[in-house]
């Protein structure tokens, strides 16, 4: 059975576009800046939502899409996205410590660490399995150990330190604020001393399908129940699916992702296209 979300849809005849957020291995091209320059890394999910977003949705991708839809006052963007399948959705400063450029870069250091932890042997694959689940959630028996080398050849792929700072600000704030630049710069950028909050309740026009799990430690169920489901307009929630025994990585790499997530999403889109 095909285990790739993209190929499940492509094999069914759908056009598929894959996006890479800024800072990842394939998201480092710029018309005037180079990744070696600090200015290149002056972005967070604010800029991803404002300038970069495409119809993709897993983990941080859901936060970016929710934010972009919340900023869509005239509904022009929502008209382009008929249905949005949000997998492991996320709703709700250590700048000097992390530096000012990229965080978890795709370079020789992370490659060496990944190779050391995630080797080719069965024992090494199991060790890698355990290390990854420390941040994603408890082991679910969905991990395909034979694909470990493929997964770790591209991950981690990197992001900006500013993006990590923005995430920390959001955690401390308890909601979804724009990036906090400090009072002086906030006044210049936003016209007020504090960053504005994004109102997910303002989202309209796009049907949202939520796929989440109690075992996901990053797309936390408390965040889903106490924030997303309360903030989103019930009229836009087309589906609210609580999957059993999915950790954060299983939505992309789990053996059960195709039958429990990808194929149901494919059926919804196919029925929609056929007018059923």
Please name every model-derived segment.
Residues 236-276:
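Catalytic active-site module of serine/aspartate enzymes centered on a nucleophile-bearing elbow/loop
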Residues 203-204, 209-212, 216:
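Short beta-strand/loop motif that positions the catalytic acidic residue
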Residues 217-223:
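Conserved alpha/beta-hydrolase "acid-adjacent" motif
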Residues 1-33:
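Short, surface-exposed "cap/lid" segments of acyl-processing enzymes
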Residues 63-190:
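Alpha/beta-hydrolase-fold enzymes
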Residues 27-47, 65-68, 244:
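Catalytic cores of eukaryotic secretory-pathway lumenal/extracellular enzymes that build
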Residues 40-64, 84:
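Alpha/beta-hydrolase fold nucleophile elbow
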Residues 192-205:
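The feature captures the conserved acid-bearing segment of alpha/beta-hydrolase catalytic domains
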């Amino acid at each position: 059975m095909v285990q790739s979300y993209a190929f499940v849809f492509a094999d069914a005849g759908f056009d598929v576009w894959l996006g890479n957020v800024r800072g990842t291995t394939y998201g480092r091209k710029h018309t005037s800046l180079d990744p070696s320059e600090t200015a290149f890394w002056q972005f967070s999910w604010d800029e991803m939502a404002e300038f970069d977003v495409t119809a993709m949705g897993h983990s941080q991708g859901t936060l970016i899409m929710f934010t972009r839809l919340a900023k869509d006052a005239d509904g022009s963007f929502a008209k382009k996205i008929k249905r949005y399948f949000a997998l492991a959705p996320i709703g709700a400063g250590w700048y000097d410590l992390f530096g000012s450029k990229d965080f978890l870069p795709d370079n020789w250091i992370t490659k060496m660490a990944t190779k050391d932890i995630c080797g080719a042997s069965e024992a090494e694959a199991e060790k890698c399995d355990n290390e990854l689940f420390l941040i994603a959630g408890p082991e679910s028996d969905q991990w395909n150990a034979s694909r470990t080398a493929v997964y770790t050849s591209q991950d981690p792929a990197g992001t900006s330190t500013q993006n990590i700072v923005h995430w920390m600000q959001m955690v401390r704030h308890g909601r979804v604020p724009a990036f906090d630049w400090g009072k002086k710069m906030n006044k210049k950028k936003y016209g007020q001393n504090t960053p504005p909050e994004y109102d997910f309740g303002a989202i309209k026009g796009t049907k949202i399908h939520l796929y989440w799990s109690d075992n996901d430690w990053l797309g936390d169920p408390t965040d889903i129940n106490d924030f997303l489901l309360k903030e989103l307009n019930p009229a836009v929630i087309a589906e609210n699916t609580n999957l059993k025994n999915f950790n954060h990585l299983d939505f992309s790499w789990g053996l059960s992702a195709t039958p429990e997530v990808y194929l149901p999403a494919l059926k919804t889109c196919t029925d929609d296209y056929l007018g059923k």
